[in-house]
Structures are given as structure tokens and as C-alpha cells.
Amino acid sequence: MLASEQKTIVREYRESKGLSIKEVSKGAKIPIGTLYDVEIGRRSLKDNKAKKIADFLEVPIEKLFRPTYYRAISITD
């Protein structure tokens, strides 16, 4: 691991389940490069992709990710 890389909770959960990054990439339908960048803290995801990873790992999304993208509340909400 390079000094600029950090280990994330996503990677911890993946490794604790004995899964390869390729298996999670395929199962969550997320490109392997994207998943790698997420795991080292280089990239954020929109909520739908984060949810795919959380669902595949069977972990609540809030245990893996901080909300970083927000949508304006519509008047009908």
C-alpha cells in the first residue's frame, strides 16, 4: 500500500468475508477500478453505487460510507 493510500472500512469488510476485489466488483456490478479507488479512499460514489456494494457485502450502507452527495429537497417532499 502506498503512503497516499488508506485502508477503508469497505476493504476491511471485503477482506473479512474472504472476498477478492474481483468478486465484489462482479457481484455488485461496479467496475473493478472504481471499487479499488473507493477502497483506497481515492474516490467517492453516488448513493446507488454505494448501496450496491453494501448490499453485496450484506452490511448497512451507513457502516461503510458517509453521505457525500446531497440533492435539493423538492417542494413536494
Each PLM stretch: what is its role?
Residues 1-5, 36, 69-75:
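A detector for short, charged/polar N-terminal pre-domain segments
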Residues 1-17:
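A short, Lys/Arg-rich alpha-helix, primarily the initiator
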Residues 8, 18-19, 45-48:
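Residue-level signal for the short linker/turn that defines the boundary of a DNA-recognition helix
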Residues 13, 55, 63-77:
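Short, charged recognition helix plus adjacent turn
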Residues 15, 29, 40-42, 69:
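Residue-level detection of the helix-turn-helix DNA-binding "recognition helix"
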Residues 18-37:
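Short alpha-helical DNA-recognition segment
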Residues 29, 48-63:
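DNA major-groove recognition helix of helix-turn-helix/homeodomain DNA-binding modules
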